[in-house]
């Protein structure tokens, strides 16, 4: 958030607008300014909040690889995969954070071609950049299928805690963004170094917060 002040400011504006009564921006509101409750946060749709969360997860590549075992003999893009083979799917390389590799479409199965029509692909010009707007449709609605994202795996063996993660992120990001401004850090503290194991975690997590005191703005 601190590294992307424009996205942070837009998110705060849209959260304040969405929770206008709670934050005291409604002229006829009888209550004093306060942070929204958990129920209010979960019941209020803020497409740009969803976009920020999804883009943060995409760029964080928390789980760099997903493993699957072939239960039957099969073929992947023309390559024979015997039953019992462990297949590792990288979720932080081409198509995710790098431009997609060229693939002969005739090698894809009908199911793969159909799935490709459902999911979008990322613009190779900015696939490595933090661009929350990539998750929004032209009408401003959130599009969870805008492009590939596999931080939680996929299919019936995907992460069973996925829904809880999104709920927690929606609550925490909303409250922190409404209450505080994330200020820029010195270069020595503003790093993206990670500790790598089966998942990735930040080596350090420094923040510089400033309370938000000016709640009045024009959308």
Kindly label every feature range from the protein language model:
Residues 200-219:
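C-terminal helix/juxtamembrane-tail motif
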Residues 83-84, 90, 95-98, 158, ...:
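Eukaryotic short linear interaction motifs
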Residues 56, 81, 130, 155, ...:
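Hydrophobic, well-ordered secondary-structure elements that form the walls
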Residues 89-140:
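Conserved cytochrome P450 K-helix/beta-meander segment immediately N-terminal to the heme-binding cysteine loop
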Residues 5-8, 162-200:
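Cytochrome P450 heme-binding "Cys pocket" and the immediately downstream C-terminal segment
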Residues 27-30, 139-151:
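Active-site-adjacent bridging/hinge elements
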Residues 4-62, 82-85:
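Cytochrome P450 I-helix active-site segment
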Residues 75-80, 86, 148-176:
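C-terminal, well-structured subdomains that either form a transmembrane helix-short loop-helix hairpin
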């Amino acid at each position: 958030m601190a590294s992307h002040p424009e996205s942070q400011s837009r998110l705060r504006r849209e959260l304040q607008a969405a929770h206008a009564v709670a934050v005291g921006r409604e002229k006829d509101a009888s209550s004093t300014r306060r942070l929204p409750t958990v129920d209010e946060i979960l019941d209020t749709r803020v497409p740009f909040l969803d976009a920020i969360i999804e883009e943060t997860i995409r760029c964080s590549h928390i789980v760099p690889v997903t493993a699957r075992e072939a239960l039957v003999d099969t073929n992947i893009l023309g390559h024979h995969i015997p039953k019992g083979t462990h297949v590792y799917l990288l979720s932080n390389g081409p198509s995710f954070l790098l431009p997609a590799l060229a693939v002969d479409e005739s090698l894809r199965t009908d199911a793969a071609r159909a799935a490709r029509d459902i999911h979008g692909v990322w613009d190779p010009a900015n696939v490595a950049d933090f661009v929350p707007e990539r998750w929004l449709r032209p009408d401003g609605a959130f599009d969870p299928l805008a492009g590939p994202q596999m931080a939680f795996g996929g299919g019936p063996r995907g992460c069973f805690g996925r829904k809880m993660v999104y709920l927690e992120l929606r609550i925490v990001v909303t409250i922190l963004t409404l209450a505080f401004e994330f200020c820029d850090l010195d270069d020595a503290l503003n790093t993206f170094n990670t500790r790598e194991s089966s998942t990735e975690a930040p080596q350090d997590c420094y923040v510089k917060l400033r309370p938000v005191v000016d709640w009045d703005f024009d959308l």
